[in-house]
């Protein structure tokens, strides 16, 4: 199964290492790990390569989180992919820091990036990989997700990226349930 992996985040150096940008962080990890580079077109960056006899396309939307869905008409047309190939990587404040959750389908919850994608696609029937960023419940949710990780939190998140960079490229229809078990039982 070819994979279209879209990591959500906000463009710009001021959002680097923020909780909301863990999707971008995982894409960046995969790019470095596989010696790739990102190419910029219109409203996203991408890298396209082969891994274990399948096509992998990595995407970072440049539309800001709340407009992430705007990229999909051009992405699906350019790469000849469908929703069945799609894996969205996104932050989740309902999961503890370092906990991951892979799902075949799901809702949008309070996540505006997922709402934008579901609105654009007209469906919530796409796979997603949630990366737990915790929630301190002391500040506004917006301020919390746009805040940078502390040094100790960032170390844990980098461990998550290392783990996920080994796991997600080999996801396919035959082993999706096994990957769910492996990824969902992990915690860093």
From Swiss-Prot:
Function: Hydrolyzes ribosome-free peptidyl-tRNAs (with 1 or more amino acids incorporated), which drop off the ribosome during protein synthesis, or as a result of ribosome stalling. Catalyzes the release of premature peptidyl moieties from peptidyl-tRNA molecules trapped in stalled 50S ribosomal subunits, and thus maintains levels of free tRNAs and 50S ribosomes.
Keyword annotations of the record: Cytoplasm, Hydrolase, RNA-binding, tRNA-binding
Active site: 20 (proton acceptor)
Annotated site location: Discriminates between blocked and unblocked aminoacyl-tRNA: 10
HAMAP family reported for this sequence: Pept_tRNA_hydro_bact
SUPFAM superfamilies, per the entry: Peptidyl-tRNA hydrolase-like
Residues binding tRNA, per UniProt: 15, 64, 66, 112
Top enzyme category: hydrolase
GO cellular component terms, A-Z: cytoplasm
GO terms for biological process, alphabetical: protein quality control for misfolded or incompletely synthesized proteins; rescue of stalled ribosome
Gene3D superfamilies registered for this protein in UniProt: Peptidyl-tRNA hydrolase
Name the UniProt record assigns to this protein: Peptidyl-tRNA hydrolase
Subcellular location: Cytoplasm
UniProt source species: Borrelia turicatae (strain 91E135)
Pfam families: Pept_tRNA_hydro
UniProt-annotated site: Stabilizes the basic form of H active site to accept a proton, residues: 91
GO MF assignments: peptidyl-tRNA hydrolase activity; tRNA binding
């Amino acid at each position: 199964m070819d994979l279209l992996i879209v990591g959500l985040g906000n463009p710009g150096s001021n959002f680097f290492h923020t909780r909301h940008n863990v999707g971008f962080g995982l894409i960046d990890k995969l790019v470095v790990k596989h010696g790739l580079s990102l190419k910029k077109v219109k409203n996203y960056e991408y890298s396209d390569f082969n891994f274990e006899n399948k096509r992998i396309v990595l995407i970072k939307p440049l539309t800001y989180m709340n407009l992430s869905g705007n990229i999909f008409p051009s992405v699906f047309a350019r790469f000849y992919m469908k929703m069945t190939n799609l894996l969205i990587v996104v932050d989740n404040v309902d999961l503890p820091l370092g906990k991951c959750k892979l799902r075949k389908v799901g809702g949008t919850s309070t996540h505006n990036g997922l709402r934008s994608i579901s609105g654009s696609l007209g469906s919530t029937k796409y796979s997603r990989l949630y990366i737990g960023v915790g929630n301190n419940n002391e500040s506004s949710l917006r301020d919390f997700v746009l805040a940078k990780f502390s040094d100790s939190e960032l170390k844990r998140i980098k461990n998550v990226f290392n783990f996920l960079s080994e796991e997600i490229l080999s996801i396919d229809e035959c082993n999706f349930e096994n990957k769910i078990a492996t990824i969902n039982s992990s915690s860093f």
